[in-house]
Amino acid sequence: MPSVRTEDRVSREVSITRLFDAPRELVFRCFTDAEHIATWWGPEGFTAPECASDPRPGGKLRIVMRGPDGAEFPVDATYLEVEAPTRLVIESNAVGPDGAVLLEAINTVTLVERDGATEVTVHARATALVSEAAAMLVGMDAGWTQSLQCLDDVLTGAVDRQFVIMRVFDAPRQVVFRAWTDPEQLQHWWGPKGFSLTIDEIDVRPGGTWRFTMHGPDGVDYPNVSRYEVVDAPRRLVFMHSGEGVTAEDPAFRSTVTFDDMGGTTVLTMRAVFETAAARDLVQEKYHALEGGNETLDRLGEYLDTR
């Protein structure tokens, strides 16, 4: 590895806490068992086709992450501390194509039992060893946040009953969050291509209601009602969504929209979770929901470009 000037080294720390509705022993195994790790490790859209784990002090952990574009990102790690089922300390290295270490990190994972659920806190301190790797630090917060969401999806069985769409917008997350909550801005982009929007009511607070009608290009109207459960500006929105009424033909779903800062740009992840896989499939067949969601975010991107 080439020598590195001290001034090239850049460090960053992140700390993320997440509550999982699962026993602590199971969650701990998800962090240490290779078969479990492979089901959730990595940001949204990534897979882990290669994973080997030896969870003991001095034992090795190797993960090869594969991005949506097929690019692979090897991670070589060593377990420093293993206290089942309460604590892990892992030293990890991100490796470049030539085998050189680009980034090194100390990751501390603590697991606390909370009335049958498990509170997980991940504290990561990473140092870029070369200036070219400094950009990797920018996405560390978003990467861990999305990875833990993927773990939650696995633990709750949501993988087969949800839609997930992710985009990167060249705008600060405060601006993107505002576009989701300001009725004047929503008028400019909400809905698939060719749709327009009438907002009858919007009260962006926990317990508040958003009542609106989407007007299709064929003249068909689609009444909608959403009720906000979480409003955490500018990080997250959670709302229950339904049409005119919840029926077997029009099932409700819970939408979670996260806004992760990545060096002044925003990684937006939109997740819609249904009660069953059949309900998800029905909405996809009837409304082409996935295509509509992608077109909606296309319109959001076009709108933000004009700001």
Each language-model region and where it sits:
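Glycine-rich portal/gate segments that line the openings of hydrophobic small-molecule binding cavities
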Residues: 49-93, 198-242
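Surface-exposed helix-capping loop/turn segments at secondary-structure junctions
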Residues: 151-159, 302-307
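Hydrophobic pocket/interface hotspot
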Residues: 27, 37, 61-63, 79, ...
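A short, structured loop/turn motif at beta-sheet edges
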Residues: 24, 56, 80-87, 110-119, ...
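Hydrophobic/aromatic beta-strand elements that line small-molecule binding cavities or substrate pockets
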Residues: 18, 50-51, 75-81, 104-113, ...
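Beta-strand/loop substructures that line and gate deep hydrophobic ligand-binding cavities in soluble
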Residues: 89-91, 97-145, 240, 244-294
